[in-house]
Amino acid sequence: MAQTFSDEHFTLGIEEEYLLVDAETYDLAEAPDALMAACADKLSSKVSPEFLQCQIEVGTGVCASIADARADLRNLRATVAECAGRFGLAPIAVSCHPFADWKDQSHTDKDRYNQLARDLGGVVERMLICGAHCHVGLPSENDRVDIMRQMTYFLPHLLALSTSSPFWQGRDTGLASYRLTVFDNLPRTGLPPSFASFDEFQRTVDLLVDMEMIEDSSKIWWDLRPSAAFPTLETRICDVSPRLEDQLSLSALIQCLTRMLMRLRGSNQRWRVYDRFLINENRWRAQRYGVSDGLIDFGRGAVVPLPELVDELIELTEQDAEALGCVDEVQRLRDLAVETSSDRQRKIYKGTRAAGGSHQAAMRSVVEHLLEDFHVDL
């Protein structure tokens, strides 16, 4: 029998991690306790410290639509920027700071982060990276695991469109998402395994918990996972987007893909589940090239340019975008398929150098550009 679903189930929640920079030097700066208190006074539990003291995390409430998510996330960004400004600081939404040194940073003194530092040793010290996580509501536990198996195919597409981390410690890495290179040093990361049911997933988690390897599934950091805290499927592969509207377009696509896969299942159809080895090749291509080169279409047996793939995704999710009220946001992905933040950052750097600026001046120009991007849609 074909299964049905309600569009009310596909709620959205968006989490973003920001870096705090000194408004004068553009280098990283630690968040003073008074700043966190000021943010909490206005945003309550929607704002929190992150692993490093130069980071801050925000999270929307449960949003019924992309319009609700826009209003919530815009307020979060604007409030954090306003509060930070009182202390001579400013937030940037970027996955790697262009020139800051991870060795100069300190981790936040909280039980969870102290435990991470003890468990992960020197690997976690390099986690000077920020990501964006998108939660889509799926009330059924088995639905979350089933859709996770199918959605994994699209993770490289989402990564390519989100890339914002070409620089690391003052040099061009040659990658569009260096963040993933750093993050993949942690255990329990990468593409999720394929589970036949939620029970199988839970047994796997319980095995590690029972052996005291982890406390719970929140210590599993796959690119896509059933949330440990909410009845959602959490997409975690994306770099954080400097611009608000880019983040919303990516979140809208994730929401639409989730609905599309559920819709197919309602007609007794499903997306083909490819071997993780093949999807990992596309993941690497997205990490390396962003949108400047294509991804492999395994059905065609060919590398297809990102603009063409995005056109296909828009067509594939057309009725889902209409049902969810996010047609404009999904259509905007055509712009990202041509140029992501990584491309813009490199363009700023090269332009400053071509105009006679020093390497240091060019790096500062990139941060200045990121500061402008943070405010462009507020």
Curated annotation (Swiss-Prot):
InterPro entries assigned to the protein according to its UniProt record, in alphabetical order: GCL_type2/YbdK_subfam, GCS2, Gln_synth/guanido_kin_cat_dom, YbdK
Gene Ontology biological-process annotations: modified amino acid biosynthetic process
Disulphide bridges: none
Assigned keywords, A-Z: ATP-binding, Ligase, Nucleotide-binding
GO MF annotation terms: ATP binding; glutamate-cysteine ligase activity
Family matches, as Gene3D superfamilies: 3.30.590.20
Reaction it catalyzes: L-cysteine + L-glutamate + ATP = gamma-L-glutamyl-L-cysteine + ADP + phosphate + H(+)
Annotated signal sequence range: none
The EC number(s) this enzyme carries: 6.3.2.2
Superkingdom of origin: Bacteria
Pfam families tied to this protein: GCS2
PANTHER family: GLUTAMATE--CYSTEINE LIGASE 2-RELATED
Role summary: ATP-dependent carboxylate-amine ligase which exhibits weak glutamate--cysteine ligase activity.
Similarity field: Belongs to the glutamate--cysteine ligase type 2 family. YbdK subfamily.
Protein name according to UniProt: Putative glutamate--cysteine ligase 2
